[in-house]
Structures are given as structure tokens and as C-alpha cells.
């Protein structure tokens, strides 16, 4: 694994020094993100999205792309009246889009802040795993489970059974057919 990681840097440096185009085909998400200036994400022979690694990660055009790159929770909801009510919860998110009716909300776990004191959404920690540089948690919110990633140094602050409060930094709204409806930034 360490050799593979160091080779990423070496290949990228050679490409940059020579000023050449390199086509690199991989199923490894980390390699694709780390080594690419441009990514073409293909599913069944059809380009789903092309762009910089950051564009594709932060603004995935459909649920396939969002799910393929990184970790994400998809939650069904109902849009209307400037809000999205998440199914199986009491959670209502602000929504400025025009869509009404069925939607699916995509939330990346690193875009959730978890606290014991304050936040917009109340939940209960059901599991937590120490990963060294990160804590990987599952938090029950009503009838759904959200994944939350924290810095490793705060891992011991939260244990299963703890009541916690979550705040979302941003989320993505998809139409019920899986296509991008809107990306929303919260508290920015």
C-alpha cells in the first residue's frame, strides 16, 4: 500500500515535469482522485460526468457518481414549501429549490458536525469505530442511520448510546429519478 501511494506521487510528478497527457484507467477511487487533473467517470460505457476530481466529488450530477466517489448516505424525502422533510424522521431541511414532491437527499459523512451540546438534528450514537486519523460513527435519527466522520483526536468523546446533535454543512438534492436537482450549502 505504501509503495502504491508513493508511486502515485512519482507518476504525477513525471507527468507534470514532462508536460504530457497521461490516460490512466482505474477502478480505485483514491487513485483516480489523487492522480487526475480531469476525471471521466464511466458507467456501462456511458460517461456519467467529466471534470476535475473536486468538481466530481463536490458536485456529482447523479446518484451513481455521488455513490461511486466517496462515502454518502441517501435519504428519501418530500420537498415543498421551502423545506425537505426526510422520511422516517422529524427532520426538516431548508430548501430553496422549485421541486415539489419526492426527492432524495445525499449527505457526505464529513459534511456533518457532531456535538453533545448543540445542533439542528438530534440523534443517538449506535456505533463508533476508531480509524486512527478519524472516528467513523453511525447515528440513529428517527428511523434512519447517518454516517458521521470526525477527527480521530475526538473519538473518545462519543460512545454508543450517547445523545448527540448534528449540523449539516451541505447536502445535495436529487430528483426522484436520481438526477441532480440542487446542491445546498448550510450556514455559509
Task: Describe the function of each predicted region.
Residues 1-64:
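ABC ATPase nucleotide-binding domains
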Residues 46, 52, 67, 71, ...:
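Gly/Ser/Thr-rich helix-start
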Residues 72, 83-188:
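Non-catalytic connector elements of ABC transporters
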Residues 58-80, 106, 167:
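C-terminal boundary and immediately downstream tail of ABC-type ATPase nucleotide-binding domains
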Residues 29, 52, 61, 71, ...:
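A generic "binding-loop/recognition-motif" signal
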